[in-house]
């Protein structure tokens, strides 16, 4: 049910309960009206749990139910069933209002001002410049991109940030391999995307390291040269990083992932040191005998030690900083630059402890005062035989996964579409729909095993199925537009009397509350489930009902408007889930 109908009923019951309390001289601190969906649709459209009101008022359930029924029976069909009141909404007016609202609001249907311009930073992706994005990155990216759209849809002001890790030991590994084996070759000459080109050298380094004991020493020498800003080392580093970043940005473009600002770690990693030194001056941290600057962290509940705290080094005795220190600097920069209210880090579950420590230290040093910091931890995406390892080259590569899915469905598409470029575009859209939906439909915290066959299903709980239903509805609307049927100026929505039409109207009207729930829970899977439910209900409806009937143009006109509302709702969901909408399939 729409928010307005629920709100109206809630307000009316609130007044009834308040008056009942006054008549019995009962003082009320708070009235909690619990609105639910009945377990079966034939029981009603809205269910009110009276048990909680009974506890609050200290009155029998029957007494409260009788008072509410007496006050509302003129407007609604309402029946008591144990501790519940089941209410049926007047259908005709509701169907008319819902369809007109959806078709008038179009792309904005389902949006709200729930978060009322709250300024939220979403940091996601954060790739390394030594390899291409793997499917784990694709999961991170689609979670970040989808959540940014969902939070915007409920009124938040979203800033999407990406911190690219372009320095450190892992970057030096690709650099060393290129110096030894690259022979001045370029991605263009090798006919490879820049990130894949660099990734090959990262894998090559690990093979080299297995056969050469001094490989680690060579890496440390190269890292020292970088830190000392050796000209030839910096030149090589910039060249390789540019190639990698160019390739990564191509993947972002393909997957419809964008950012408001991209930071390079090499440009800001020193800022954290100054933040820690300020903390040292204020007495928030301390200097150890060897010169290292430390802070005490609280112990986790499962840690056993003689002390109540554990020591955390923020700046090493040689003056270098750790990742946590660099992240402290990033928080300070973003507060100054954006003055956000909340910052959400979309990062894998392996970093839970890091963020726990980061948020504690940030608060203790007074950096993030009055700011909410949150780690949205997501599970891993695994191969059939376990977790991915890029150093061995045993990884589900993001670009190659997209290409693999495209190649799987291209033969079928080329049978329908002769133009090769159009066929490839359709194949890409279906591949992205398959991947994005599959990566979003599970609970974020869960590890998943990517199942190619399941992701590409045109009949199951999948992106291509949602895309197919959208394209099917569009083809019906296009067919209607080609027919010589008189235009009906005043649509008679009272003709929509089929039970499945009512079921679908109820689902359509719940879009806003589902978007709000997805935003509150930071959980796009709420919208994958919602989209699948709507698509399934339409498919069942279409099997039973003849939409276009030239012998009944009034009913046809009403059903066409009904289908427009279904399609608009599906399209709005697809946008929020970063799934391409397709006119034809």
Curated annotation (Swiss-Prot):
Q: Which GO terms describe its molecular function?
A: arginine-tRNA ligase activity; ATP binding
Concerning SUPFAM superfamilies, the annotation shows: Anticodon-binding domain of a subclass of class I aminoacyl-tRNA synthetases (SSF47323), Arginyl-tRNA synthetase (ArgRS), N-terminal 'additional' domain (SSF55190), Nucleotidylyl transferase (SSF52374)
Protein location: Cytoplasm
EC numbers = 6.1.1.19
InterPro entries (UniProt xref): aa-tRNA-synth_I_CS, Arg-tRNA-ligase, Arg-tRNA-synth_N, Arg-tRNA-synth_N_sf, ArgRS_core, DALR_anticod-bd, Rossmann-like_a/b/a_fold, tRNAsynth_Ia_anticodon-bd
Q: For the motif 'HIGH' region, what are the positions? A: 127-137
CDD domains given in the database record? ArgRS_core (cd00671)
What catalytic activity does the UniProt entry give for this protein?
A: tRNA(Arg) + L-arginine + ATP = L-arginyl-tRNA(Arg) + AMP + diphosphate
HAMAP family (UniProt xref): Arg_tRNA_synth (MF_00123)
UniProt subunit comment: Monomer.
Listed NCBIfam families: argS (TIGR00456)
What does the similarity note say?
Answer: Belongs to the class-I aminoacyl-tRNA synthetase family.
Q: What is this protein called?
A: Arginine--tRNA ligase
Origin organism is Borreliella afzelii (strain PKo)
Source organism phylogeny: Bacteria, Pseudomonadati, Spirochaetota, Spirochaetia, Spirochaetales
